[in-house]
Amino acid sequence: MTGEHVILLDEQGNPDGILEKYAAHTSDTLLHLAFSCWLFNAQGQLLVTRRSLSKKAWPGVWTNSVCGHPQQGESTEAAIIRRSRFELGVEITNLTPVYPDFRYRATDPNGIVENEVCPVYAAQVTSALQVNPDEVMDYQWSGLETVLQALSAAPWAFSPWMVLQASDDKARELLREYNQG
């Protein structure tokens, strides 16, 4: 299979095949493996990104720093590094799991469904951003507490996966601990 794909999973989270990425995301999306990463700079600010309008699901919505899908034979950590370079042009370090068993299903206003087992990580950015406009239309560095308050006050302005990740008490505490070094 050429191009990006998703790793399909059975209900127990075991690999159960692969499917082309764009064919996978429909109104009846099968359960598949993904990842989500919250990136912090040296000043302790969180990178929040706004998804490009060309994205199939949740175009123009604010979300956490970077998301994607590991490819067959690729570790989640290697996939996060690959997508951080592709979407944001950055190098990262200190990649740490903060919500390894996160799973969700959500439907965007266009009817596209996300149905993912999506381990959540935090990492430190070690280089300047060079944003890929096909992936990210805007971005903002902000304090973690400010972002958490915004997620609570206006969840409709953010991706559902970011809102759900931040609503988990343990994940929120691990993000705070990570950010404090």
Swiss-Prot record:
GO terms for cellular component: cytoplasm. Mn(2+) binds at residues 25, 32, 69, 114, 116. Binds 1 Mg(2+) ion per subunit. The magnesium ion binds only when substrate is bound. Binds 1 Mn(2+) ion per subunit. Its cofactor is Mg(2+); Mn(2+). Pathway: Isoprenoid biosynthesis; dimethylallyl diphosphate biosynthesis; dimethylallyl diphosphate from isopentenyl diphosphate: step 1/1. PROSITE patterns: NUDIX. Keywords: Cytoplasm, Isomerase, Isoprene biosynthesis, Magnesium, Manganese, Metal-binding. Gene3D superfamilies: Nucleoside Triphosphate Pyrophosphohydrolase (3.90.79.10). It is found in: Cytoplasm. The active site is at 67, 116. Its EC number is 5.3.3.2. Residues 30-164 form the Nudix hydrolase domain. InterPro entries: Idi_bact, IsopentenylPP_isomerase_typ1, NUDIX_hydrolase-like_dom_sf, NUDIX_hydrolase_dom. GO terms for biological process: dimethylallyl diphosphate biosynthetic process; isoprenoid biosynthetic process. It holds the Pfam family NUDIX. It catalyses: isopentenyl diphosphate = dimethylallyl diphosphate. Mg(2+) binds at residue 87. GO terms for molecular function: isopentenyl-diphosphate delta-isomerase activity; metal ion binding. Catalyzes the 1,3-allylic rearrangement of the homoallylic substrate isopentenyl (IPP) to its highly electrophilic allylic isomer, dimethylallyl diphosphate (DMAPP). Homodimer. Belongs to the IPP isomerase type 1 family. This is Isopentenyl-diphosphate Delta-isomerase. It comes from Citrobacter koseri (strain ATCC BAA-895 / CDC 4225-83 / SGSC4696).
